[in-house]
Structure formats: structure tokens, C-alpha cells
Amino acid sequence: MVMTLLGPILPLLTIRWGLTDMQAGYLFFAQFASSCIGMLASGMLVHRYGYRLTLMFGLIVSAVGVALLARADWGFGLTAVCIFGVAFGTNTPATNLFVANTYAPKSASALSLLNSSWGIGAMACPLLIALAERQHRVPLFLYALSASLVVLAISMSAVSFRVDAEKPPALQTSGSTVNPWKHQLLLLVAVLFFVYVGSENSVGGWVASYARRISTDSSTFWTITPSFFWGALLLGRALAPFALRKTHETKLAGAGVTLAALGVSVLLTAKTMTPVVIGASLAGLGFSSVYPINVSLLSHWFGEATTRVSGAIFAVGNLGGAVLPWVVGALSTKLGSLRAGLSVPLCGALGMLIFYLVHKTKSS
């Protein structure tokens, strides 16, 4: 929920702080650029303190950032966003790699289910913000969210992580064990993560602002449009394990980014709220299986060296989450059209489709 908070709350912050789209884009940049720091530190923290303490640390830091955002001005707000960005960066690779190692034979399915639980929070966040906005209680909502994170962190102190008492097992794969930094796929995979995270967050982060400008009435329906994106993404990740029983990972990912490109295209042609909802839903469904599949394929691409390169790859991915949403805002400000800015995730989806088509051909 925390990492999708900016999307639905961004129009409110834009009004409160008097921001242009380019300035609003700096919030996304701050969030994901700071998360790179957490991602680079995540492996060291897990190695030294274990998964449980690392996750507790991330939750507490995230709670601090959310609480500070409740009453912050523009400058202090950037700081608050950076704080929970670091927390997200710490917990994301730790959680994903823990699941990938534990369920190595079926890691793509397990990661899809894991990310489905994340999607529940992402879908609920816009609905809760819309409710809080109608009651003029958005700061109270942020304080409540912060308190919930603290409670969750405290509750984890009673949970025993078996793997923390063991040496983390190497992924059982048939991948290559050569120096991963010289692997011919390393740069391409890093770019793939960069483009995916950036494209997903560009749509999820800007769709509420886009819907608000299209809306012709005084209702706050636009605030819940991200829920259609994240809800479809949640549904897709819940269904992905079933699809993966009959479909190869790269084939499913290729179909996904094709559907995402179609969804963004519908958004770009929207003049009323109905196509916005349809486009956001198609884009979310299309993007849903791509990230879990990419994570699961790391072990096939890099073998036992996956843990050595994963931190850098995750960090590059989050850099995409920082850069591409900012580019959307910058293009919108320069060209005077958020519609033009949203061409960025469309190009990203088409670029990923090319990668999967080429990789599938080489694999064959």
C-alpha cells in the first residue's frame, strides 16, 4: 500500500503544494531513487541480521516516512517520500529472493501469489484515500497507516523465520556459473527491469491525475481509478500460477506486455471516464505477471550467481521507477498534455515485447 500511495494522493498534494506536473514527477523520482539505496543495502542486512529483522527495520522506517507526509510541506514531503522509499528498497529484494529460494521449483507461481497480496493493498489504497478525502481526514488516514506498519513490525517479532537459522541455499538451477558481470544478458536484463518498473509505476502513479483532468463532474470518482489498475494487476497475479502450468514464462510475459500496450493505448484515446477505467484495467492485467516472471527467470539466466547480481538488477529496476514517471511529468509540462507524457509507458511495453520475442527466438 505504501509504495502505491503517491498515485492516488498525488492530485491532492499537487493542489496543496501548487505543483506542476514536472515538480510532481520529482516525488516519484525521490521515492524510487531512494529505494535504490535500500536495495543495495538489503543483501548486507539480510546476511548480517536475517530476514525477520530486515523486514521489521523496513516496516518501522516506512511508518516514519508515512507519518511525516501527513503534515509536510513540499520540501519536507520530499524527505518523507525518500524515507519510505529506502524502506521499500530494503524489503523488496529480501522478500522476493526469500520466496524464490524457498519455492525454487515453482518460483514464478509463488512470486505471483506473493505479489497478489501486495496488490490487495495497492487496490485498497485509492479507495481508502477517496473515503478519507470525502471526510477531510487524509492526514488521519496517513497516521493510521503509519500505526498499522508499526503494529505489523512488532507482530513479526513473534514470528520465527527458519531460514534465518540456516545458510541460505543456492538456487537449484541449470543456469551458468560464469562471472555474471560479463554475462551477455546482464545489461539487457537490467534494462528490462528498468523499463518494467518504470512503465508500471508511470501508469499506476499518473492515472488518477489523468482521470481528474478528463472528469467533467465534481465527484471524486477519479481518486479510485488507480484501484482498477492495481485490482486488475492483483487478479492477474492470482491467476498467473494457473496460466504458467500450460504456458512458458516468456510467452506469458510477452502476451502480458502486449495487453498492457493495448490498455495504455485505450487510455491515450480516452475522452470520458469509461475508457480510462477500461484502459487502466487492461494495463494492470497485462503488467501483472511480468515482474514475478522476470524475478523467477534470474536464476535461469545467471545460475548460482543470481544473488551476486540481483541487488544491482533490482536497484536498476527501481531507478526506472524513479526516472520514467518523472519523464511522464516532464513531457506533460513541456508539451502541455499528460496524454503525451503517458506515451512513455506505451513505448516501454512495446520495448519489453521486443525483448521477449527475441529471447524466445534465441531460446528456441
Language-model segments: which ranges?
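Helix-loop junctions at membrane interfaces in 12-TM secondary transporters
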Residues: 70-80, 269-278
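Residue-level signature of mid-helix packing/kink "hotspots" within the transmembrane helices
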Residues: 4, 31-40, 123, 230-238, ...
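Conserved MFS/SLC helix-loop-helix module at the cytosolic interface between two early adjacent transmembrane helices
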Residues: 36-75
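C-terminal transmembrane helical hairpin of 12-TM major facilitator-type secondary transporters
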Residues: 250-294
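Cytoplasmic helix-loop-helix junction between adjacent transmembrane helices
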Residues: 81-116
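Extracytoplasmic gate region of multi-pass secondary transporters
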Residues: 6-7, 184-227, 231-235
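Helix-loop-helix hairpin linking two adjacent transmembrane segments in secondary transporters
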Residues: 105, 113-164
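Interfacial helix-cap and linker-helix signal at transmembrane-aqueous boundaries
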Residues: 13-14, 45-46, 128-136, 211-212, ...
